[in-house]
Every structure is written in structure tokens, then in C-alpha cells.
């Protein structure tokens, strides 16, 4: 079976991009002939992870330079590069807009599939951000709600012809998506958002695949004081790091004055977040590491006990099952894909992500758990994550879905 996997850009390392590459490796391991096609490619960050899978790209990222620009809409004439050579394939899988609707408008190959990490937020801010839509008004000073109001929902974005979410662009996207042969979503939450954005479509859920390392047993509870807390995320406002910093500052002042927060990731909000840490008086306890390799993230994880991340309207969040697989106790938001991963709070603490007090209380609740409860929670979280997100579980589900379309290995 010949498979083409389409993605607009492989320059920064995010959950959607990691999942796309892992799916490509899984399909290749099942015996398919797989090629990845993307506009922009950063070999320094991706070559090792991609391995032997061929990558066709239009422009390479130059180290130290900004990533090359990529098409932002399916009508961009540069989309022709992404859709080239599809006639020779049996299956094409699009990841991320505008590859999704562009593939739906194409006539080849026989099976055109969109793996939906989330519908494009800038086109469908209300449909894809139900939590922010319902809660932005109660926390107007928080950066996430402010970003929702002033950027995602800006009046300029809705202007005819020139607006990013103009009626014309939304209509073109919907036509393309409805032309697809199949849609797979990364969570039940995303499936519902797809239906809110595009109407009543047949959407199947295929959970992302997570590699779980064979680590030493972390039984033995937690140290009582001086906890290491890890967060891994892109530093942008919808990831809600400002609330996490506020909550951590309160937790540190009230419950654990020797605790430290390790922030892994990069993004445009970093300078403002570093300044916020200084204003809160926790600059010495918050460590901004920037981008780290998988090996360095694993090493840092081994020195931490808790994982905390509070993204707003997160469709899935690869970092949550990854943290569970490393034996970290997990704190996440009370909605979206993370709530689904944490089984409604059974496998970790879930809190109101716009309340620093709730964040501090959640961290304290985990930190004060008995050793027996800590070990039970770690074991339950790891078992559940492996059952849903392991390579074996994903391969079994993927085979079943493809067989419905006469695609076998």
C-alpha cells in the first residue's frame, strides 16, 4: 500500500507534528510504503525522529532563521506542491489545515482521509473553543481569554474577503472537508468540535500513539517538600502558562517554599512569562529551558515528581499520557482532551484552569497525597495510558478502520 502523509510544516516540534511522524512510522512498520510531504522542513529537529521515511519538502529551514512561510489557505497556488504525486498513492492522510480541505477538494487518491488534531481555530473560534466561549468573560485579565477576545474573535477576522474567518473562507473549507472520504479525530472532544464546525459528519476516534519507556519503578510516594514540577508546552497564550505561574507562586508561598517549576518549550509568550515570574517573586524557582531533545526531557522528568499543564480547549495533549508514562503525577484542566485522558479526574487532578487558587489547591492535593495513594495513582495512570495509547492499541484500531475501506496490510 502506498501512503502519502501531508502536513503544512515540520519546523517546530509540537504534539500534532510528533503524532503525525509516529503514525507514519507505525504505518511503515505495518508494511506500507510511506512518504511525508511538507512545505517546510527542519532536518536538525526532525531527521532522527523521522528515521528512514522519505520526506519531500519545498523549503528547508536555515538554522538561526525564521521558518519559511507556508500556505495559509487551500486556494494558495503553492498547495499544488503538497498535492503533487497523489495519483500514484492508495491513501493520503492530511494533518492540519489547509491540507485537510485541499485534500478533500482533490480527486486523488482513492481514499482521502483527514486526521483531525482540531479544526482550524482561527476559522471556527466559537466551535473549537467552547470553554473559552463560555468562560472568557469571568477572567478578562487572563491572557488566554484576552487572546480569544482580541485575536481569535477580532472584528477584523470576520471582514468579507480579507478576514481570516470570512464567510467565504469558512464556506470553502467546509466544502473541502465534506469532500473527504473519512475523518479521524484524536479524541471524543475533537470529534464533537468537528461536528460543531462542519455539521453532522461521520467521524471516528483514533487516539494518538504514545511510546512508553521502560523505566524503573517509581514506587515510594513523594518527597515531602522541594517538589519538582514539570510543564512541557509551546509558550503561547492559549496554553495558559500565566495562570500556572500564578498558581505555582501561591502553592510555593503557602505549601512548599522549596518547590521548583521547570518549563520546557519555546514560543512568542516567553519574554512576558519570564517577566511575570520576576513580578511574582519566583524567578529563581522557575526554570525556562526552551526546546529540549526527547532525551533531555526524559532526564529532566526523572528529577521531577509532578506534571502540570493547563491549556485552554486542548483537543488532546500528547504531553499528558507521556507524563503518565514517566510516572509523574498529573494536574490538568477540567475540560477538553486532557480531561478525557485523565478519565474525569480518576487518573490525576483536574482543576479550573482560570483560577490560580484552584491550581494551587490541586498541586497541594497531589503533594499531600499519602505514599499509598501516590503509588496507586501512578500505577492506575500508567495502566490506563498503555491500554488506550500504546503502539499495539493504536495499530489494532487503525487496522480495523482501514479495513472498512478495503485497505489491508
Model segments located where?
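A charged, aromatic-enriched C-terminal amphipathic alpha-helix characteristic of glycosyltransferases
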Residues: 74, 372-403
Amino acid at each position: 500500500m502506498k501512503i502519502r502523509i501531508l502536513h503544512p510544516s515540520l519546523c517546530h516540534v509540537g504534539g500534532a507534528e510528533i503524532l503525525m511522524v509516529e503514525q507514519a512510522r507505525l504505518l511503515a512498520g505495518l508494511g506500507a510504503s510511506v512518504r511525508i510531504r511538507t512545505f517546510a522542513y527542519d532536518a536538525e529537529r526532525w531527521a532522527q525522529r523521522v528515521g528512514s521515511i522519505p520526506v519531500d519538502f519545498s523549503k528547508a529551514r536555515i538554522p538561526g532563521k525564521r521558518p519559511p512561510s507556508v500556505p495559509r489557505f487551500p486556494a494558495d497556488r503553492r498547495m499544488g506542491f503538497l498535492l503533487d504525486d497523489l495519483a500514484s498513492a492508495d491513501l493520503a492522510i492530511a494533518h492540519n489545515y489547509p491540507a485537510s480541505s485541499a485534500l478533500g477538494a482533490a480527486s486523488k487518491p482513492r481514499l482521502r482521509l483527514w486526521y483531525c488534531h482540531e479544526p482550524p481555530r482561527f476559522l471556527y473560534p466559537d466551535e473549537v473553543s467552547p470553554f473559552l466561549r463560555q468562560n472568557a468573560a469571568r477572567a478578562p485579565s487572563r491572557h488566554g481569554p484576552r487572546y480569544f477576545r482580541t485575536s481569535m474573535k477580532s472584528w477584523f477576522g470576520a471582514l468579507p474577503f480579507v478576514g481570516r474567518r470570512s464567510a467565504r473562507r469558512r464556506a470553502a473549507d467546509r466544502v473541502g472537508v465534506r469532500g473527504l472520504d473519512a475523518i479521524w479525530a484524536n479524541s471524543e472532544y475533537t470529534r464533537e468540535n468537528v461536528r460543531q464546525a462542519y455539521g453532522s459528519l461521520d467521524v471516528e476516534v483514533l487516539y494518538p500513539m504514545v511510546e512508553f519507556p521502560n523505566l524503573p519503578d517509581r514506587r515510594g510516594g513523594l518527597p515531602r517538600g522541594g517538589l519538582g514540577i514539570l510543564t512541557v508546552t509551546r509558550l503561547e497564550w492559549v496554553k495558559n502558562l500565566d495562570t500556572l505561574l500564578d498558581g505555582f507562586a501561591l502553592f510555593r508561598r503557602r505549601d512548599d517554599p522549596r518547590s521548583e517549576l521547570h518549563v520546557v518549550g519555546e514560543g512568542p509568550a516567553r519574554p512576558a512569562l519570564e517577566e511575570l515570574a520576576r513580578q511574582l517573586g519566583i524567578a529563581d524557582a522557575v526554570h525556562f529551558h526552551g526546546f529540549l531533545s526527547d532525551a533531555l526531557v526524559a532526564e529532566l522528568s526523572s528529577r521531577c515528581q509532578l506534571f502540570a499543564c493547563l491549556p485552554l480547549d486542548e483537543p488532546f495533549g500528547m504531553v499528558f499520557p507521556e507524563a503518565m508514562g514517566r510516572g509523574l503525577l498529573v494536574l490538568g484542566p477540567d475540560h477538553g482532551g486532557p480531561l478525557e485522558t485523565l478519565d474525569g479526574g480518576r487518573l490525576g487532578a483536574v482543576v479550573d484552569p482560570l483560577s490560580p487558587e484552584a491550581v494551587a489547591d490541586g498541586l497541594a492535593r497531589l503533594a499531600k497525597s499519602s505514599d499509598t495513594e501516590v503509588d496507586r495513582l501512578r500505577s492506575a495512570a500508567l495502566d490506563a495510558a498503555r491500554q488506550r495509547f500504546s503502539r499495539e492499541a493504536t495499530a489494532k484500531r487503525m487496522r480495523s478502520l482501514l479495513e472498512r475501506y478495503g485497505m489491508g496490510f
